[in-house]
Amino acid sequence: MKKFKFLAALFAGILLAGCSNSNATDNTSLSLNDSTAVAVKEYPDTATLIFFGDAMQHKMQLTRAITLGTKENPYNYDDCFTLVTPALKDADYSIVNLELPLGGGKDYSGYPMFSAPDSYAKALQDAGFDLFLTSNNHCLDRKDKGLRRTLDVLDSMKVDHIGTYRNLEERTKLVPFIKEINGMKVGFLNYTYGTNGIKATNGAEVAYIDRNKIKEEIEATRKAGAEIIVAMPHWGVEYVLNENESQRSLANFMMNEGVDIIIGGHPHVVQPMKVVTDPITGRRSLVVYSLGNFISNMTKANTRGGALVRVVIERDPNTGEVKFRNAEYDTFITEVPSGPGTNFRVVPSWEIDKLPAAQKGNWTQHNNAVQKLYDKYNVDVPRSTKKYQAASNN
């Protein structure tokens, strides 16, 4: 997406001459050969970030991956995420919550102590995800060893990840995490409310929600050069469609400390999205309380699917400031296997014709519930009208 332009040597020379110091000595001179050109990077003035919710693996998903496996790929998740690839590729940076450790061995499992094969994460990467969030209530399901192995696997995949660390020293080294996206320096932070009562026993480091630490890391991220900051807390109450006072309080705290975009997870159902405008400064921030599940085998009301949110940030051409521009959402549902060769699969609204007829009722219920909630509570975050080119698989 980056564009380059070359400035003619004459123009460069004029600029240099115009900036010459009148106090320079007579034998000081600047010259450019006629064939010299100066390469200047030119970026678009916007960047699009796309966020999805909780990537889960329950027992039936694991069983299906084994059923469809081959000698070369014994745990097959290849088709699970491909229908959303057009949306991921259309964005400049794509983020997902990896709500499980990659435990290794053959002792994989679903709820309540998750552990998934490495191929699960690889399928997410192949679909187009760039950043994996690892700070959530299941990151210590396989204790310190599983947490560290997850990081080893993600590092071997050369994919970005934040939220958990091998030790405190590594956290100090890797935070702030700043990504340059279309020339804009974006800081990312990830925290969790807890880890289901499991504590690290061998020095592994989890980014827990701690206001003093959050404040410290926000300040460090700004100081390190971030022009805009995104925080992604794992918070709230499961299966509740509205945020609670604790979430609102933490969101206000983070915005007051300088966070521009907040994308929450954990409830396994969607919660409202709101653009918040500071009445004094006019600064606009985005709060998404929960995106719900990305993929799972949950069957409780409102857990079969979730929402994605596309966020556009921009560089102001007049001030050079990077800021939040707008956001829009879309919906999707998890298709469950319906015959030989089929797998659990995320089916977005623009591909809903590929959902088996017998599951259309689940889609209607989920989509209508999300639409009703968002129509009532969303503030300046409309449904997307963007159309993506259909994925190639059926």
Question: Residue locations for each model-derived region?
Answer:
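Bacterial N-terminal signal peptides that target proteins for export
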Residues: M1-A8
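C-terminal motif of bacterial Sec signal peptides marking the signal peptidase cleavage site
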Residues: L15-G18
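Acidic, metal/ion-coordinating pockets
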Residues: S20-N394
